From Swiss-Prot:
Family, as annotated: Belongs to the binding-protein-dependent transport system permease family. CysTW subfamily.
Protein name: Molybdenum transport system permease protein ModB
One Gene Ontology cellular component annotation held by this UniProt entry: plasma membrane
Primary location: membrane
Protein function: Part of the binding-protein-dependent transport system for molybdenum; probably responsible for the translocation of the substrate across the membrane.
Occurrences of domain ABC transmembrane type-1 (ranges): 11-217
Annotated source species: Azotobacter vinelandii
Source organism, top-level taxon: Bacteria
Amino acid sequence: MPLSEHDLAAIRLTLELASLTTVLLLVVGTPIAWWLARTRSRLKGAIGAVVALPLVLPPTVLGFYLLVTMGPHGPIGQLTQFLGLGTLPFTFAGLVVASVFYSLPFVVQPLQNAFEAIGERPLEVASTLRAGPWDTFFTVVVPLARPGFITAAILGFAHTVGEFGVVLMIGGNIPEKTRTVAVQIFDHVEAMEYAQAHWLAGGMVLFSFLVLFALYSSRRFKAGLS
C-alpha cells in the first residue's frame, strides 16, 4: 500500500489543523486588517510590523518563543493552567494556536489590501442611508472584499498545510496527535524510507501547484492583492 496508516493519520490531522486554523485566522485577521486599513494611528506601522514578523523570522525562532510563552512558566501557559486546561505545547490545541500566529500575515495582508481598495465612497453612501457600522461592514464591505477573503482563506489554509519548523517545535512528533504531513515526510527521510516520502512529498507538490494555479489564474487573486 503506497500510504501507511500513519501517513493517512498525518493527512487527516493536517487537514483538520488547516481547516480549524483557517477559520480562526479569518476571525482574528479580519478586525486586524480592517483596523490597519482604516486607522491613521501612529501605531499602525508598529502593529503592521508585529503582524508581519512571521514572514521574516526563522520558524525555529518563532516556535521557540511560542514554546516558552505557552509553557508552564509563560503567560499563556500560566493562564491555561489557571483555567484548568493544562499547557498547550505538544497538544493539538497548541498546534492550532501556533499556526494562527505563524500564518496570520498571509491572511491579514490580502484582507487589508482588499479593504483599502474599497475606498471611502461606498462607506459614505451607506452612512447617508443611516446604516450602522455593523450593517455597513457586513452588507457593503464584506461583499466588496470577497475576493480578498477568498485569497486570504486559500493562502492561510495552504500555508498551514506546509508548516514544519513551528509545528515540530510546538507539537513535537506524536503520532495521530501532533504529527502532520510535513513531519511525517521528515520521519520517512530520516528512516531512509524514500518511497513513502515520495508519495507524501509528491502530494504536497501537487497540492501547492494547484493552489498557486488557482490563485494566479483567477482575477480574484489580483483583486485581493492589489
